[in-house]
């Protein structure tokens, strides 16, 4: 699943650690989401989208190419 979390985070001037603390997850979790190695749970995806003032659909993109 592709996502816009890195671009949203950097546009808001946040480090991975700052975002992790705001979401109550580890920095490694944020890093894994940004590198698309980990798909967040629905509650975390919603929390991330709300934090950045966007929708889950705009923050995360399902890749249907396979």
Name the predicted role of every residue range.
Residues 3-22:
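Short basic helix-loop element that most often maps to the first helix and adjoining turn
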Residues 18, 29, 58:
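Residues in the helix-turn-helix
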Residues 35, 54, 64:
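Short, conserved catalytic or interaction motifs in soluble domains
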Residues 25-38:
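Recognition helix of helix-turn-helix/homeodomain-like DNA-binding domains
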Residues 37-47:
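Short, basic-rich loop-to-helix N-cap that marks the start of a DNA-contacting helix
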Residues 50, 58-66:
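Short, charged recognition helix plus adjacent turn
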